């Protein structure tokens, strides 16, 4: 059985996920929506099999799984609508633009019995797997602490330039976009 997927938010991450999901026969990322018509047009060029729906609600109604790649300021209503409709959720982070908004979203989602996952790609990669194996074998010695040092020649990174909201602290910034991966990573270690 294939999983029918709606993608809400067709910027960089939405388009990347569309391309990668299409490679897997267990997923049908056929239902798309974004308020930006240009992003919708780009997504259809990338994947002519999919269809831009008239609204986010239409996309959600057709899917088994809803991937939310929209900016965090607008994510909550889509997430709650999908959960209320009994749809599994795959979320980008951060959940909201501050801790209160994020906590409210999580509390709201807990009222529904739907699977929820967050796209922390580095948490399932070879680097973490290798590190956990080395830790288990005692090859690292005693863990005394963690230093996270992140630098980039430019922010946002070149591949993220289309997501202008990432440049600004209220919704993005390097800490929310990058450091969150490393915090999740180190928490697992």
What are these regions (language model features)?
Residues 104-122, 144-146:
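Rossmann-fold dehydrogenase core element
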Residues 93-94, 120-122, 150:
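Short strand-turn motif at the edge of the Rossmann-like AdoMet-binding core
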């Amino acid at each position: 059985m294939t999983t029918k997927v709606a993608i809400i938010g067709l910027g960089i991450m939405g388009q990347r996920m569309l391309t990668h999901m299409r490679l897997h026969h267990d997923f049908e990322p056929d239902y798309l929506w974004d308020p930006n018509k240009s992003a919708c047009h780009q997504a259809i060029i990338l994947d002519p099999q999919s269809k831009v729906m008239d609204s986010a609600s239409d996309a959600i109604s057709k899917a088994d799984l809803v991937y939310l790649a929209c900016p965090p300021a607008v994510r909550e209503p889509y997430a709650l609508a999908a959960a209320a409709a009994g749809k599994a959720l795959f979320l980008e982070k951060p959940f909201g633009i501050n801790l209160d908004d994020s906590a409210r979203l999580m509390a709201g989602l807990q009222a529904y019995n739907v699977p929820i996952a967050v796209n922390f790609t580095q948490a399932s990669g070879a680097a973490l797997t290798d590190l956990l194996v080395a830790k288990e074998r005692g090859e690292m010695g005693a863990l005394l602490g963690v230093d996270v040092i992140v630098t980039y020649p430019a922010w946002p990174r070149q591949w993220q330039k289309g997501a202008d909201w990432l440049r600004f602290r209220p919704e993005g910034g390097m800490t929310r976009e990058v450091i969150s991966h490393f915090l999740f990573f180190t928490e697992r270690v």
